[in-house]
């Protein structure tokens, strides 16, 4: 690349791609600087929202092995690079777009898999990772409790039967003596 500034920008974008497991491409046409600042704040610490140059982003994505943005890099573009919970970032973008319809989600990727606008909306409708994990843990705990009760039922029945048999044998032994 002839221009060192452009080479540095591509290197920075490649670094952002490599340090994030998800990214959401948006068009921000019509948003003010104050609105972009609000969006960055809403995304939190686990996501970085960067206004990008389309050509340099295409080069960085291609060099990073990311094909999710092919054909979508047109107009004023910005990317939310997500290193934390992708569901929370998608929710933040969805909520911001409700109040600011100028923000348009174009697509993205999650763990190397390309996602279109509708898939990102579905991602935003999911519950957070912590809630999903707690539901799985609760279901597993309930299943284990049921299994333990099933295993204990025959065991306790066997113990009661053995106690009754021993009592009967003791009773017969006392009567014989």
Curated annotation (Swiss-Prot):
The keyword Iron does not apply. One of its GO terms (cellular component) is large ribosomal subunit. GO terms for biological process: translation. One of its GO terms (molecular function) is structural constituent of ribosome. Keywords: Ribonucleoprotein, Ribosomal protein, RNA-binding, rRNA-binding. Pfam families: Ribosomal_L10. It comes from the Bacteria. Belongs to the universal ribosomal protein uL10 family. Part of the ribosomal stalk of the 50S ribosomal subunit. The N-terminus interacts with L11 and the large rRNA to form the base of the stalk. The C-terminus forms an elongated spine to which L12 dimers bind in a sequential fashion forming a multimeric L10(L12)X complex. PANTHER family: 39S RIBOSOMAL PROTEIN L10, MITOCHONDRIAL (PTHR11560). Forms part of the ribosomal stalk, playing a central role in the interaction of the ribosome with GTP-bound translation factors. This is Large ribosomal subunit protein uL10. It comes from Kocuria rhizophila (strain ATCC 9341 / DSM 348 / NBRC 103217 / DC2201). The gene is rplJ.
């Amino acid at each position: 690349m002839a221009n060192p500034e452009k080479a540095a920008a591509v290197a920075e974008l490649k670094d952002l791609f490599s340090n994030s497991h998800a990214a959401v491409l948006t068009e921000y046409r019509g948003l003010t600087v104050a609105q972009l600042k609000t969006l960055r704040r809403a995304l939190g610490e686990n996501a970085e929202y960067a206004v990008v140059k389309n050509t340099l982003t295409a080069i960085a994505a291609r060099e990073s092995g990311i094909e999710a943005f092919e054909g979508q890099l047109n107009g004023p573009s910005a990317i939310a690079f997500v290193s934390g919970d992708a569901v929370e970032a998608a929710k933040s973008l969805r909520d911001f777009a409700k109040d600011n319809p100028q923000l348009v989600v174009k697509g993205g990727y999650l763990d190397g898999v390309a996602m279109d606008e509708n898939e990102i909306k579905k991602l935003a409708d999911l519950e957070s990772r912590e809630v999903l994990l707690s539901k799985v843990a609760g279901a597993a705990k309930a299943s284990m409790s049921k299994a333990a009760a099933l295993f204990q039922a025959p065991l306790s029945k066997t113990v009661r039967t053995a106690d009754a048999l021993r009592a009967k044998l003791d009773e017969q032994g006392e009567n014989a003596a």
